[in-house]
Structures are given as C-alpha cells and as structure tokens.
C-alpha cells in the first residue's frame, strides 16, 4: 500500500507538519501490523481495473458507470469486490454492480447534511470512516480534501478498490490509524465522528482529541448512540449492548451536549434524533452475518436482546472557539 500521493498532496498544505511523523508511522504499520488476510485483500484491489467513469455522481449517492464495459468485465469486477466482503457501509452503484451494504449510510448522510456548514473548499477529517462511503459524499458536497482514519485494514482495501473504480480521485485518502495516533494537527475545517464515541473507554478524551484536530472556528459533527433520558443520564451497558462487546458509555443527547461544552466547544446544537430501523441496518448478500434484527428482543423491538433501549442515534454540531 503506497501513501506517496498523500504525502505529496499535504506537503504544501496546513497539514505539512504531519510529515514529520506520518511516513515512519505508516512504514512501521506495514512492517509490523498487517492483518493475516491483507495480502489477499490487496491482491483483489490490484486485479481490479482502473476505470474512468463516463458518469459519476457523488452528490446524490456514490454511483459510476460507463458504456464501454462488457458483461464479462462487469462480472469480473463484482467477483473481486465480493472478495472484499463483508461490506458494511454504503451503498455503492458501480458499473451495474450494486453493493447493497449492511447499512444504508446514505440515510445517515441525509440526516446530517442539512444541519452542517457548507463543506465547499473545506479540509475534512472523518474519524472511524469505515470503507469511506461518507468521504465520497463529502467530496460530492464540495470538500477540497477529505482524510479518513480507521484502523480496520479491510476498510482500507475496500476504499482503494473504490478509488480505482471512481477515476483514481486523489482528493480523498484513508489512513489505517486511530484518532489516538494523530498529533494535534489543528488543521481541519470540519471533523466528523460518526458511530465512534460509544466505542471509546474515555469519551471526554475522544472529544478533546477531535477538538485538537480542528482549526479555530472549525466545526465538529458528532453522531452517536444516545438514550432518551434527562441531561444527567448515561447508560453504561454490561458485557454487551445489541450483541456488541465494546460499548462503554451511551449518554442522553442532553448529557452529551454538556460533555461537549465541558470540553470547550461552543454553539453546541442537537440537530437530529433517529431510531435505527431494520431497514437501515440489515443482513444482505454483501454482508451475510447477523445484523440488527438479530440484536433486538424478538418480542419487543423497542429493546435490545439484552433488555436495553433499542438503538437511538443523535447528531450534534459544535464549534471550536
């Protein structure tokens, strides 16, 4: 995996000081931390054709098409993309191959986009970006540069596969890092953290880490699980929540607003609440394991299988002074 293009891209940008540490960090990752299946995933990416779409739409979805592809080529693309399963965040429509992902991430984007500052010309960080679906939508909304970070290596390969099929667009780059591995860059106009906070053992530390990536006046877009309760309530689940082990703190939206203000954010707004439905998160032919339907109480879908409130998500927007 070659990150040279990204290094060259940021060399003359406000992110240039990241080059003091990042190349050595990623070289160490490639030497010491590769997943056992990484070579197989990387090979699938390598075998994919580098295509220049005749039609490309990142504004209303992530779709690309070309009249030049034969049915055999299309089938070959689908086979290689299926080698990168499971596909969790999407959907993608690529030359007649429709990747029906576990999550309808476009629905989340539709809930978020009306409430945030215009991304036109902005440098954006997407923390916990998955395979990068929202990164492409951020470009579609006018972002100048989008950097995604996610330590899951399958997501990196899925992202690079998409890049090959979307015309080798170099305005978006995914790095296999967690937020705690970033220096205090203070260089991003907008930082997104969507579906991450409840996985963090120390949520206030996470909020400070996000703040440290923003320029003064920059905007945080935070999307996470919440509970329907007063401003002082926080759920601390037992061993599992909706069958997930690594869930630590689920505050009410009001409590989360208080946390953001305690961390020094201003103009904190709760802009959306939405229950996750089994239409938004479900098993598909591109993600064949259990999904939300199996994680809810079969007799009472307002509760998880463990008896906690079913997943409710909120979007908050805040500003770094």
UniProtKB/Swiss-Prot annotation:
EC number(s) stated in the UniProt entry for this protein: 2.5.1.-
InterPro entries: CmoB, Mo5U34_MeTrfas-like, SAM-dependent_MTases_sf
GO molecular function, one term: transferase activity, transferring alkyl or aryl (other than methyl) groups
Residues annotated for carboxy-S-adenosyl-L-methionine binding in this entry: 89, 103, 108, 128, 179-180, 194, 198, 313
Keywords: Transferase, tRNA processing
Function: Catalyzes carboxymethyl transfer from carboxy-S-adenosyl-L-methionine (Cx-SAM) to 5-hydroxyuridine (ho5U) to form 5-carboxymethoxyuridine (cmo5U) at position 34 in tRNAs.
Record-given protein name: tRNA U34 carboxymethyltransferase
The organism of origin for this protein: Erwinia tasmaniensis (strain DSM 17950 / CFBP 7177 / CIP 109463 / NCPPB 4357 / Et1/99)
């Amino acid at each position: 995996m070659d990150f040279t293009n990204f290094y060259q891209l940021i060399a003359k940008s406000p992110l240039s000081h990241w080059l003091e540490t990042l190349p050595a960090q990623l070289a160490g990752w490639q030497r010491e931390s590769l997943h056992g299946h990484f070579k197989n995933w990387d090979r699938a990416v390598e075998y994919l054709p580098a295509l220049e779409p005749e039609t490309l739409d990142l504004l209303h979805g992530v779709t690309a098409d070309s009249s030049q592809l034969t049915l055999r080529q299309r089938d070959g693309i689908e086979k290689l993309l299926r080698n990168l399963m499971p596909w969790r965040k999407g959907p993608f429509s690529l030359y007649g191959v429709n990747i029906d992902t576990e999550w309808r991430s476009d629905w989340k984007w539709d809930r978020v986009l009306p409430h945030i500052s215009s991304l036109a010309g902005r440098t954006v960080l997407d923390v916990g970006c998955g395979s990068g679906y929202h990164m492409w939508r951020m470009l579609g909304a006018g972002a100048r540069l989008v950097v995604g970070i996610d330590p899951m290596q399958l997501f990196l390969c899925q992202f690079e596969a998409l890049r090959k099929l979307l015309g080798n667009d170099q305005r978006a780059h995914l790095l296999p890092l967690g937020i705690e591995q970033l220096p205090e860059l203070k260089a991003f106009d907008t930082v997104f953290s969507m579906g991450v906070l409840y996985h963090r053992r120390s949520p206030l530390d996470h909020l400070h880490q996000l703040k440290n990536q923003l320029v003064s006046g920059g905007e945080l877009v935070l999307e996470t699980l919440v509970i329907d309760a007063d401003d002082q309530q926080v759920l601390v689940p037992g061993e599992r929540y909706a069958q997930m082990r690594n869930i630590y703190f689920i505050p009410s939206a009001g409590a989360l607003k208080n946390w953001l203000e305690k961390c020094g954010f201003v103009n904190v707004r709760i802009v959306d609440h939405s229950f996750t439905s089994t239409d938004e998160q479900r098993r598909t032919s591109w993600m064949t394991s259990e999904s939300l339907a199996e994680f809810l109480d079969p007799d009472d879908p307002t509760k998880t299988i463990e008896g906690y409130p079913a997943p409710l998500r909120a979007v908050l927007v805040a500003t770094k002074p």
